[in-house]
């Protein structure tokens, strides 16, 4: 089972794609059943497209967004449309604080995107909102903490804590896909700053604002 994530892409590295396709190939060599479940697809180089097309021949493929499904069809890969299983998580029974805005940045993005998010956070504070900056990858996101040092910051890699805060907040602004997914699971309005096609694809699927 190759499940839940954006593994079939070269944005991280071609080596990453090679690794996951090798896992699929080994599984088939040992006559194991293989399923691609709720993945996104792309971006891929022409080389990556050829490798993925070959690796997925005869494999059941379920993709988690419409853009990935259309991409698969252009590549001649039969696939069905699913959704991220995290959307099925029940939100905790926590009172909603309408003035609380959860801001979820990400390290490793263009400085312009972080600046946009920082300016938005400052403006929300000026308008009387409570802004909580949530860092979901402690260590990796430390450079982001410096950018938002004047704001309240919490670090966690626990999805249960993220879901709790998303359910508590009145609004979520996220650069990270799972910040958006758990906001949707909690029924909290959200907006996306897209660093990756999968983020824009999810926002588009749900009718949320994104840029």
Regions found by a protein language model. Give the residues of each.
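Active-site anion-handling motifs in enzyme catalytic cores
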Residues: 1-211
């Amino acid at each position: 089972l190759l499940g839940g994530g954006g593994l079939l892409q070269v944005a991280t590295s071609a080596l990453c794609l090679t690794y996951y396709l090798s896992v699929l190939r080994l599984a088939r060599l040992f006559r194991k059943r293989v399923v691609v479940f709720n993945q996104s697809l792309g971006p891929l180089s022409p080389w990556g497209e050829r490798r993925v097309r070959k690796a997925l021949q005869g494999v059941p493929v379920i993709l988690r967004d419409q853009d990935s499904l259309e991409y698969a069809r252009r590549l001649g890969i039969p696939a069905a449309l699913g959704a991220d299983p995290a959307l099925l998580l029940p939100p905790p029974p926590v009172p909603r604080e309408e003035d609380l805005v959860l801001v979820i940045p990400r390290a490793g993005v263009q400085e312009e995107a972080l600046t946009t998010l920082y300016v938005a956070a400052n403006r929300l504070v000026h308008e009387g909102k409570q802004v909580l900056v949530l860092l979901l990858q402690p260590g990796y996101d430390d450079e982001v903490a410096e950018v938002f040092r004047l704001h309240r910051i919490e670090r966690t890699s626990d999805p249960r804590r993220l879901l709790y805060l998303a359910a508590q907040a009145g609004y979520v602004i996220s650069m990270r896909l799972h910040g958006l997914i758990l906001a949707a699971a909690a029924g909290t309005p959200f907006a996306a700053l897209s660093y990756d096609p999968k983020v824009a694809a999810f926002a588009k699927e749900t009718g949320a604002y994104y840029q």
